[in-house]
Swiss-Prot record:
It holds the Pfam family ILV_EDD_C. It catalyses: (2R)-2,3-dihydroxy-3-methylbutanoate = 3-methyl-2-oxobutanoate + H2O; (2R,3R)-2,3-dihydroxy-3-methylpentanoate = (S)-3-methyl-2-oxopentanoate + H2O. [2Fe-2S] cluster binds at residues 122, 195. This is Dihydroxy-acid dehydratase.
Length: 611
């Protein structure tokens, strides 16, 4: 039977000093011996996805204490990728994931906490906490802040649903008036919560459901809806239950590494591919698997991508569909239910809230349950009132979206496409692989060949696109933006958004050793590995070289002979693998420290110490 970790600081005469300090935090005689549960919050006023979390940590803490535990709350940092986008702030986004994971480990291990509830929401916070949970392997429940309501506005007599990406695209489109841009800007992000499409934050919060570490509805219940409060209340009780099961009943099935097994990771990626999630999820899932010592890699994702169809298209892939619509169609449990019918997931994986994922699906899939409570839960609708307050409205749709042929979530027999929403490509320009969000690629350019236009930084590419240097048929290559080369592997949302605003979204391709925002669509291929700074072939591309992309056959090739590539490599080795242009970005000691240990994207861009 494992001993409570917290006994190290709460029991024994020699711990009188530690107990004295615990007493100063409010603990009483009767609290020593109870499980000490860390409430890992990420409240900040910088991020709309986290601005409403301030009181939610204490909501969970009260429920933990009502269930017989001791709750102690602390915060991690949280970077808003949208605000950090398009300038040197984006260099810090991906490295912040490691800082978050480390900070959770530091606090939990320093104070010998027995378990934790992770209150996350946005892009790097959920992955960072997920990495920490698998690293620590103590009982953990995830509950996120929830998605933002989609913006709604009437423009030129037509009601339009909006999100963050619409504001970016409109601002770069010379054909849209200043007045209309201002209207879009003011309407795109109306409430607290993670940005309203199937971007990185919402994708990751959905994946925690498939991994079995969060409650049903975690990924899709709106931040503003009163139904979401139940998830926080239930998380507080649930964590005490599974903590006792582990420490008092020796039930290791409740530990993160036993819940988030390789089979669970396969379930999560099957979901990701089916719902057309952000390409960043690949990076984060690989990193989480690494922390959990789980043998799950890019080849596994490639195999899944070849057999899992695309069952849902959400913004940015389908501009008028947002997370509130996914919830109305049954949320993540409905998508998992459709995959289950097709024999595409493992039903036997345990979860924190049900004996198996299959049991959870049978209870929560709206197409197979008779529970009116479940059906009412998924009728939760947006309130349509701008607010930064959680649980502030209780609107309901009149009916659910149960249409399996033409609805937001479709059946395996009637998918949006037989190929899934994500694909792994390989070829001489990406020997270790690269990623494309196929759900956002127009069918007309699934195969694409064109001349390279090479840029040594995101900034140079943006300048070229806005000055009309890039034309239809081009393959834009942005390099030295990988984990080491950036450093920090910046997101390329601005280049892809500007291509769309220039009318080039369906007639150009973009490849990079950097990564993309979950808001990116179009033929945007990221995570090219090895990256240029590590001697990857992307560093050998020259203007005018022909690049051939074939998504159906999963290939990407630089159309040069082996002899020419070898000659260029000799030349580049002599010159050094660094950008040809002088970049003005300031690379601080903190960023250099990340770059020194960062692995390539195909390994999740995690840090590895030299052996």
């Amino acid at each position: 039977m494992p001993a409570y970790r917290s006994r190290t600081t709460t029991h024994g005469r020699n711990m009188a000093g530690a107990r004295g300090l615990w007493r100063a935090t409010g603990m009483k005689d009767g609290d020593f011996g109870k499980p000490i549960i860390a409430v890992v919050n990420s409240f900040t006023q910088f991020v709309p996805g986290h601005v409403h979390l301030k009181d939610l940590g204490q909501l969970v803490a009260r429920e933990i204490e009502a269930a017989g535990g001791v709750a102690k709350e602390f915060n991690t940092i949280a970077v808003d990728d949208g605000i950090a986008m398009g300038h040197d702030g984006m260099l810090y986004s991906l490295p912040s994931r490691e800082i978050i994971a480390d900070s959770v480990e530091y606090m939990v291990n320093a104070h010998c906490a027995d378990a934790m509830v992770c209150i996350s929401n946005c892009d790097k916070i959920t992955p960072g906490m997920l990495m920490a949970s698998l690293r620590l392997n103590i009982p953990t429940v995830f509950v996120s802040g929830g998605p933002m309501e989609a913006g709604k506005v009437v423009m030129h007599g037509k009601k339009v649903a909006l999100d963050l990406v619409d504001a970016m695209v409109a601002a770069a489109d010379d054909k849209i008036s200043d007045e209309d841009v201002a209207t879009i800007e003011r309407s795109a992000c109306p409430t607290c919560g993670s940005c309203s499409g199937m971007f990185t934050a919402n994708s990751m919060n959905c994946l925690t459901e498939a991994l079995g570490l969060s409650l049903p509805g975690n990924g899709s219940t709106l931040a503003t809806h009163s139904d979401r409060k139940r998830l926080f209340v239930e998380a507080g009780h649930l964590i005490v239950d599974i903590t006792r099961r582990y420490y008092e009943q020796d039930d290791e099935n409740v530990l993160p590494r036993n819940i988030a097994s390789k089979q669970a990771f396969e379930n999560a990626m099957a979901l990701d591919i089916a719902m057309g999630g952000s390409t960043n999820t690949v990076l984060h899932i690989l990193a989480a698997a690494y922390e959990g010592e789980i043998d799950f890699n890019l080849d596994d994702i490639d195999q899944l991508s070849r057999r899992v169809p695309c069952l849902s298209k959400v913004a940015p892939a389908k501009q008028d569909v947002h997370m509130e619509d996914v919830h109305r169609a049954g949320g993540i449990m409905r998508i998992l239910g459709e995959l289950d019918r097709g024999g595409l997931i493992n039903r036997d994986c345990p979860t924190v809230h049900a004996p198996t994922l299959g049991d959870a699906i049978d209870r929560w899939d709206i197409t197979r349950t008779n529970s009116e409570t479940v059906r009412e839960f998924f009728r939760a609708a947006p309130g349509g009132v701008p607010t930064q307050v959680a649980f502030s409205q209780s609107s309901r749709w009149d009916e659910l979206d149960m249409d399996r042929e033409n609805g937001v979530i479709r059946s395996v027999e009637k998918p949006f496409s037989k190929d899934g929403g994500l694909a792994v490509l390989k070829g001489n320009i990406a020997l270790d692989g690269c990623i494309v969000k196929t759900a956002g690629v127009d069918e007309s350019i699934l195969k694409f060949t064109g001349p390279a236009k090479v840029y040594e930084s995101q900034d140079s590419a943006v300048k070229a696109i806005l000055s009309n240097e890039v034309v239809a048929g081009d393959v834009v290559v942005i390099r030295y933006e990988g984990p080491k080369g950036g450093p920090g592997m910046q997101e390329m949302l601005y280049p892809t958004s500007y291509l769309k605003s220039k009318g080039l979204g369906k007639v150009c391709a973009l490849i990079t050793d950097g990564r993309f925002s979950g808001g990116t669509s179009g033929l945007s291929i990221g995570h090219v590995s090895p990256e240029a700074a590590n001697g990857g072939t992307i560093g050998l591309v020259r203007n005018g070289d022909t690049i051939a992309i074939d998504i159906p056959n999963r290939t990407i090739e630089l159309m040069l002979s082996e002899g020419e590539l070898a000659a260029r490599r000799v030349s580049q080795d002599a010159a050094g693998w660094k950008p040809a242009e002088h970049r003005k970005r300031k690379v601080t000691t903190a960023l250099k420290a990340y770059a020194a240990f960062a692995t390539s994207a195909d390994l999740g861009a995690v840090r590895k110490l030299p052996e």
